[in-house]
Amino acid sequence: MPKSESHGVTINYDIEGQGPPLVLVHGFSGNRNSWRGYGFVDPLKTEYQLILIDARGHGESSKPHDPDAYDYRLLVDDVIAVIDDLNLTTVSYLGYSMGGTIGFGLGKYYPQRVQSLIVGGCSPFNRTDPTEPSPMLDLYEQAADQGVELIIDTFKIWFGSITPEYEARLRNADVRAAAAQLRWMQDHSPDYGNDLSAMTMPFLIYIGEADEPAEAQECATRLPNATFVMLPGLNHVQAAGASELLVPHIKTFLAETL
């Protein structure tokens, strides 16, 4: 299984399909196989070379327990390390939630390396107060001592239900690494709002209607070249797996931008 080295950590990835390269990075608590479970890989690999990355702290990549190891600039560099190892000059990119925030970082720091960006379930703005309580951070820091069942039980309350595949991923996660990443995000979450006007590559922005979409909509209006897709009635978790709705939009967007 191919791996890359980046800032002292190992980044794991898979390659499927043939065609123009499309990098995929999952959301927090996911891994490269999330895209398979959600039904994105099979319809996309017939037209694109899919590069499915385990972000640091996830899957089979390294899982540091130091919050500073999860600086988003490092996560952006991890993607570049992979595409450098593959001798790719430019790629298209698909990221959801955490993976979407990494996408905005690519647009800021490495605009010459991305032909187009597909970003879902996230905002480029940091309008949160780091002194305000973070229920997610509190949950993971408690679970680091009490066990992962606390996370699973709480998520079932928060989201109504979770899929067996998602529950299995939670059980296999390194809770202390996840808590470290959430701690960095709480204290230092990036704000790319002032950088949007300089990101001139094509963007496809998508979000669930029940996932507080106002900031994603604002983002799409401030980007010079963006298409916006709202997924009716879907929350954050549901939108992550909405491949039947999203794949047609993704294929149309990539056909127009490659």
Could you describe each region identified by the protein language model?
Residues V9-S62:
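Conserved HGGG/HGGXW glycine-rich cap/lid loop of the alpha/beta-hydrolase fold
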Residues D42-K45, I51-S92:
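Active-site loop/oxyanion-hole signature of alpha/beta-hydrolase fold enzymes
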Residues G95, G99, G103:
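Gly/Ala-rich beta-loop-alpha elbow adjacent to hydrolase catalytic centers
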Residues F104-Y109, Q115-D145:
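Flexible "cap/lid" loop of the alpha/beta hydrolase fold
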Residues T128-S134, D145-D195:
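Conserved alpha/beta-hydrolase catalytic His-Asp/Glu region
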Residues M199, I205-I207:
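Short beta-strand/loop motif that positions the catalytic acidic residue
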Residues A210-E218:
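Conserved alpha/beta-hydrolase "acid-adjacent" motif
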Residues A226, P232-L258:
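Catalytic active-site module of serine/aspartate enzymes centered on a nucleophile-bearing elbow/loop
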